[in-house]
Amino acid sequence: MTLNISKLRIDGGTPLKGQVTVRGAKNLVPKAMVAALLGSTPSVLRNVPDLSDVEVVTILAELHGAKVDYDRETGVLTLTPDHNSQTAERNAKDIQLFGGNSRIPILMVGPLLHTIKTARIPNLGGCKIGDRPIDYHLNALRKFGANVAKDDASGITLEVPE
């Protein structure tokens, strides 16, 4: 079915007045936060909406050593990356705990493999649609040189050879 609207007519009788604050795109912010992990200096995102995925990325980024400051009122988020693999290793159990109820960990794999040479994908949560396999992600990561170091019931560990 194709919808082709060339004209939109609105008949109203009541003028609208006031102001509305519109926050940023909900699907962009978590990905922008993950991309900021690749940097070596702080990244500032503005107009950030208050979303559960922002919270999940914040927690996972902090467990990987990044510092995240988020002012919900102003919508300003500053993420300062830390490329220390020992922080992630110390927090592996918490990463597993927080990662399992979201699809966000798969987004973090690329930056983590690039910066600290290892990444863990816990068994991922999903949605009402059902299972969403990650084979195509794993195949792409293998083509970039990643190795599956461990694959068990709790998830997958990937590494980049030195």
Show the residue positions of the predicted features.
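Structural preference for solvent-exposed beta-strand-turn elements
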Residues: 1-162
